[in-house]
Swiss-Prot record:
Binding-site list for heme c: C63, C66, H67, M130
Domain of life the protein comes from: Eukaryota
One MF annotation (Gene Ontology) recorded for this entry: electron transfer activity
Oligomer status and interactors: PSII is composed of 1 copy each of membrane proteins PsbA, PsbB, PsbC, PsbD, PsbE, PsbF, PsbH, PsbI, PsbJ, PsbK, PsbL, PsbM, PsbT, PsbY, PsbZ, Psb30/Ycf12, at least 3 peripheral proteins of the oxygen-evolving complex and a large number of cofactors. It forms dimeric complexes.
Name of this protein: Photosystem II extrinsic protein V
Stored InterPro entries: Cyt_c-like_dom, Cyt_c-like_dom_sf, Cytochrom_C550, PsbV_cyt_c550, PsbV_cyt_c550-like
GO biological process: photosynthesis, light reaction; respiratory electron transport chain
Length: 163
C-alpha cells in the first residue's frame, strides 16, 4: 500500500514540477528583441510570440538538417549570420529578401538559380517539405533566421566551434 501511495505522490509531484518549470522555461522575448527588419528600406516589425515559435518549429523541420545553428553544411563559407546575409547579392538581411530567397533561391552572387539543389517553393516537387508552406510560414521562418543573432549572438552562423 505504501508503494502505491508513494508512486502516486511522486507522480503528482512530478506533474506539479513540470507545470511550473516548463512554463517558466518558455522563452519570453521582449518587443525590442522580437523587432526585425522587414525590407530593404529598413522598415521593422515586431514578431508575435506565435510567429517566433512557429518560425523555430518550421525552420527546424524544413531547414535544420542543413542549417543547424545558422551554418550551411554544404558550404561552410556561406552561413545565415547577419554579415553573410548582408554581403549576398541581392542582400538577404531582411524578411522580405529571405522570403524571396525561399521561393526562388540563387547563388550567393545572385547570378544563377539553385532551385534544383536547394529546397524552395519553386522546387517543392523535389523537396516535399516545402510543398505545404504558405507565405506566412515562409515569413515565420525568415523571422526566425533574423531573430537568432539577437538570441544566441555570435553562435548563430559561428560554425562547428559552437554546434
Amino acid at each position: 500500500m505504501f508503494k502505491t501511495y508513494s508512486k502516486s505522490f511522486a507522480c503528482i509531484l512530478f506533474c506539479i514540477f513540470n507545470i511550473f518549470v516548463v512554463s517558466a522555461s518558455a522563452i519570453d522575448l521582449d518587443e525590442a528583441t522580437r523587432t526585425v527588419v522587414t525590407d530593404s528600406s529598413g522598415n521593422t516589425t515586431v514578431l508575435t510570440p506565435e510567429q517566433v515559435k512557429r518560425g523555430k518549429r518550421l525552420f527546424n523541420a524544413t531547414c535544420g538538417a542543413c542549417h543547424t545553428g545558422g551554418i550551411t553544411k554544404t558550404n561552410p563559407n556561406v552561413g545565415l549570420d547577419p554579415e553573410a546575409l548582408s554581403l549576398a547579392t541581392p542582400r538577404r538581411d531582411n524578411i522580405s529578401a529571405l522570403v524571396d530567397y525561399l521561393k526562388n533561391p540563387t547563388t550567393y552572387d545572385g547570378l544563377e538559380s539553385i532551385a534544383e539543389i536547394h529546397p524552395s517553393i519553386k522546387s517543392a516537387d523535389i523537396y516535399p517539405r516545402m510543398r505545404s508552406l504558405t507565405d506566412e510560414d515562409l515569413y515565420s521562418i525568415a523571422g526566425h533566421i533574423m531573430l537568432q543573432p539577437k538570441i544566441v549572438a555570435e553562435k548563430w552562423g559561428g560554425g562547428k566551434i559552437y554546434f
